[in-house]
Structure formats: structure tokens, C-alpha cells
A protein has these predicted regions:
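N-terminal helix-cap/turn-to-beta initiation motif at the start of protein domains
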Residues: 22-34
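Positively charged n-region of N-terminal signal peptides that target proteins for export
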Residues: 1-4
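Bacterial N-terminal signal peptides
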Residues: 7-17
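Edge beta-strand at a domain terminus
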Residues: 129, 136-152
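Central antiparallel beta-sheet cores of small beta-barrel/beta-sandwich binding domains
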Residues: 32, 40, 47-110, 117-119
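Acidic, glycine-rich flexible loop segments
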Residues: 109-128, 132-134
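Short, surface-exposed coil-to-beta transition loops
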Residues: 40-43, 115-119, 133, 141-144
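Generic beta-strand structural signal
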Residues: 48, 98, 124-125, 149
Length: 152
């Protein structure tokens, strides 16, 4: 029985050590920069205004609409006036706050493919990897996507 207790304590110590090795602390402005979305068809620049963080599309893999031959527009937006604006430059991330625990929250994310806006939080998993969760109501009902940092 004594040997089993020792083995359990050693295993617990190894798990604790592994968890601490993998845990990284990031700074609030580590979010700033240019990120590639999961579909790899857009670059989003994350920037800061005051204490809040925002993100806008600065590059599209396919910026021209195949049907019109003109720059793609925000055609899925529910606001008819906003349907006329170019996709390039659309603000996707709005009003994110740093919570001090590798997470930015209290913000919204706009999905130009559906024209819908969702509550959202962002977790920095690694310096070059973001987990972005958009949701309606509670975060259990939503979608997660991952963005990678664009190397400059």
C-alpha cells in the first residue's frame, strides 16, 4: 500500500510539473499583430485603441468577386447600406478587453460569410496561435476557430 501511495504522489508531481512547463504567461499586447484565419483566406490586423482591442481584414486571398470582377463586398450584412462596403477593411473584432489570464473577452466578432455578429472571447494558446470562440448567449453554444500569427 505504501508503494502505491508513493507511485501516486510521483505521478501527481509529474502531472503538476508538466502543466507548469506548458503554461505560458502572455502580455496583454501580445495579441497585437497580423493573423491568418483558419480558412487561410484572410489576414486580420489586431490593433489597440485605448485599452480595447480590435481587428480588421487587411488582406484577402481572393479580393475580387468572380461574378462582378470588382472588389468583394460585405454582401451578407443584414444592413443594406453596409452590403455596399468592401470586404477589405471590415472590422471583425470589436471591443475586446484583456482579462489578465491569457484571454481577451467581452468583445464581439463579425462573420462576413454569414453577416452575423457573435459574442466572443480570444485565448492565446501559444505566442503564434489564437483560439477564438464566437457564441450566442452562453459560450457552450458556438463555434471555435484558430488563427496563426503571420510571420513578418
Amino acid at each position: 500500500m505504501k508503494k502505491l501511495s508513493i507511485v501516486i504522489m510521483m505521478f501527481a508531481a509529474m502531472l503538476f510539473t508538466a502543466a507548469n512547463v506548458n503554461a505560458q504567461e502572455f502580455q496583454q499586447d501580445d495579441l497585437l499583430g497580423i493573423w491568418l484565419n483558419e480558412d487561410e483566406d484572410a489576414h486580420i490586423e489586431v490593433y489597440k485603441e485605448g485599452e480595447l482591442y480590435f481587428g480588421k481584414i487587411i488582406w484577402l486571398k481572393f479580393p475580387i468577386d468572380d461574378e462582378t470582377g470588382k472588389p468583394k463586398l460585405d454582401k451578407h450584412n443584414p444592413d443594406p447600406e453596409l452590403q455596399k462596403r468592401p470586404s477589405l477593411g471590415i472590422q471583425l473584432l470589436v471591443d475586446f478587453e484583456w482579462d489578465g489570464d491569457n484571454e481577451w473577452d467581452e468583445g464581439d466578432i463579425y462573420d462576413p460569410k454569414s453577416g452575423k455578429t457573435y459574442s466572443c472571447y480570444i485565448i492565446m494558446k501559444e505566442y503564434d496561435l489564437l483560439k477564438i470562440r464566437g457564441y450566442i448567449g452562453i459560450s457552450l453554444i458556438g463555434k471555435t476557430t484558430y488563427w496563426t500569427r503571420v510571420k513578418e
